[in-house]
Regions:
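An acidic- and aromatic-residue-enriched active-site/binding cleft used to recognize and process polar
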Residues: 80, 90-94, 114-116, 146-148, ...
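A conserved beta-strand-loop-helix scaffold within acyl/acetyltransferase catalytic domains
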Residues: 37-79, 87-101, 227-330
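TRNA-binding/sensing appendages of the translation machinery
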Residues: 15-57, 130
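Short, Lys/Arg-enriched N-terminal segments with co-localized hydrophobic residues
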Residues: 1-13
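Catalytic cores of nucleotide-enabled group-transfer and carboxylate-activating enzymes in metabolic
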Residues: 27-30, 49-61, 66-86, 92-94, ...
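Acyl-donor binding region in acyl/amide transferases
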Residues: 97-183, 299-382
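Acyltransferase donor/substrate-recognition loop-hinge adjacent to the catalytic core
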Residues: 15-19, 169-248, 272
Length: 382
C-alpha cells in the first residue's frame, strides 16, 4: 500500500488514548516484539510460526545486513500494561536512490512487521511509524514491507484459508481494511501462482523445451553446491541485472546474499536451482525451495528440546508436497525474446521433473509476480 503523500494520522478516537506506544531499545524489547506475533496469531490455524531464533536475528543489528543500509525503529503498543501490537518503521537508503517510478525513491519510508489486536491499536501504531518517518524527513510511505522488499512485501488479501509455503507471509484478514481506512491505497498487486506439477506442459511447450535441449548454444544446469559462493555470485549478478527496471527493485548487497545464503544452504538442493547459459554465458536462473513450512509448522517456533532432531531429519531427506519458486530472472538484454521464454520453460520443466521424481512433490508455487509482468504471468498460466 502507498500511504498519503504526506504521512499523516487523522481521526484518532477516544479509545486510542488508552494505548501507549514505546520504542524498542534493547535485546529484551526485541524478544517481546517477536513474542507478540506468536500470541496474536495463536488462534490462526494457518499461521506458520517462524523459528524464534531466526525471527530475533532478523531484528538484530550486526546480524542482519539490512541494517548496514537502513535505519530501523521497532515499536510496541500496550494497553493497561499488556502488549497488544507491534510495528517497525524503517528507511532503506538504497531504496531512496531508486527512481520514484519504480515505487521507492527519495522521501519514501516504510513500515512493516505489523501485528495488532484491534483497529484502535492499528491506528496508534501506524501513527507512531508515520511520525518517526516524518521526523526523518520522509514524505511518503510504502507499506507493509517486512523489513526488506526482498523479504515479505505487501499485505495478504486472498488465501487466508490455507497456510503459506516457505518464505511467504500470512497476515490477519482484517488488516487490509484497517490500512485503507487510514487513507492507504493499493500501490501494486503481487500474485503467486499455485500449480499442479504432476500435469505436463501442453505439447507446444514440450516441443519448445525439446528444441532447447537439442540446441548446442543452450545449457541449463544444476547449481554446484561445492562452489556455493561462486554460484551465489552468478545468481546475484543475474538477478540485479534482470530485475533492475522492475517496480520495487532495490539492489541486493553481497552481504545480504551471504546472509541469506547461509540461512538457506541447508535447504538448498542442487537439482532444484538451475542456471541457464547461452553461448557459455550465464543469462538466467531459477531458484526453487522445498516447502520448509511443512516441517516447522508443528514446532510452533521452537527447536528445543526435540524439534531440532525432527528438523535435521527432514532436511537430510525432504519429501515436501509443495515447492516454491521465490526467484527467477533472465538478463535484461534477452527479456521479451523467444529465447527468454524458452529458457524459462526449460528451467521450469527440468525442476518439475526433479521435484516429482526425487522428492515426491505434487504442488508448486511461483511468486511473487508483479501484476504488470505479463510475460511471467503468461508462463505461469501455461
Amino acid at each position: 500500500y502507498a500511504g498519503p503523500h504526506e504521512p499523516c494520522h487523522k481521526g484518532r478516537t477516544v479509545s486510542d488514548a488508552d494505548i501507549s506506544i514505546t520504542p524498542v531499545t534493547d535485546k529484551r524489547g526485541r524478544a517481546e516484539f517477536v513474542d507478540i506475533a506468536y500470541r496474536l496469531n495463536a488462534h490462526d490455524p494457518n499461521w506458520v510460526p517462524p523459528l524464534r531464533m531466526e525471527a530475533l536475528e532478523l531484528l538484530t543489528p550486526g546480524k542482519n545486513p539490512f541494517f548496514e543500509h537502513a535505519d530501523v525503529q521497532l515499536f510496541i503498543a500496550r494497553r493497561d500494561g499488556r502488549a497488544v501490537g507491534r510495528i517497525s518503521a524503517h528507511i532503506d537508503r538504497l531504496a531512496l536512490a531508486m527512481p520514484p517510478a519504480q515505487g521507492m525513491g527519495p522521501g519514501t519510508g516504510n513500515w512493516g512487521l505489523f501485528e495488532a489486536e484491534d483497529e484502535a491499536t492499528a491506528r496508534a501504531l501506524i501513527a507512531a511509524a508515520e511520525d518517526w518517518l516524518r521526523g526523518k524527513g520522509m514524505t511518503r510511505v510504502l507499506a507493509p514491507i517486512s523489513l526488506s522488499i526482498w523479504e515479505e512485501p505487501g499485505q495478504l488479501v486472498r488465501g487466508h484459508d490455507h497456510p503459506p509455503v516457505v518464505m511467504m507471509g500470512h497476515q490477519d484478514a482484517r488488516y487490509a481494511g484497517w490500512f485503507e481506512a487510514l487513507g492507504y491505497t493499493v500501490a501494486k498487486r503481487l500474485f503467486t501462482y499455485e500449480l499442479d506439477i504432476t500435469k505436463e506442459f501442453p505439447p507446444l511447450v514440450q516441443r519448445i523445451v525439446a528444441s532447447g535441449e537439442k540446441n548446442p548454444r543452450i545449457r541449463v544446469r544444476d547449481v554446484d553446491k561445492s562452489r556455493f559462493d561462486a554460484e551465489a555470485a552468478i545468481i546475484l549478478e543475474t538477478l540485479n541485472d534482470a530485475w533492475a527496471d522492475n517496480w520495487g527493485f532495490v539492489p541486493i548487497t553481497p552481504a545480504e546474499v551471504a546472509y541469506t545464503g547461509k540461512k538457506l544452504k541447508p535447504l538448498v538442493r542442487e537439482d532444484l536451482i538451475m542456471i541457464a547459459e547461452y553461448e557459455g554465458e550465464p543469462v538466467a536462473f531459477m531458484m526453487t525451495l522445498p516447502d520448509l513450512n511443512e516441517a516447522i509448522r508443528p514446532m510452533r517456533g521452537r527447536l528445543f528440546p526435540f524439534n531440532w532432531i525432527r528438523l535435521l531429519s527432514w532436511l537430510r531427506k525432504p519429501r515436501p508436497r509443495a515447492m516454491r519458486v521465490p526467484l527467477m530472472g533472465v538478463r535484461k538484454h534477452l527479456q521479451s525474446s523467444r529465447l527468454a521464454s524458452q529458457l524459462a520453460f526449460m528451467m521450469i520443466e527440468f525442476i518439475r521433473r526433479n521435484a516429482i521424481a526425487r522428492y515426491g512433490s505434487v504442488r508448486g508455487e511461483i511468486g511473487w509476480i508483479l501484476d504488470d509482468n505479463q510475460g511471467m504471468r503468461a508462463i505461469a498460466d501455461t
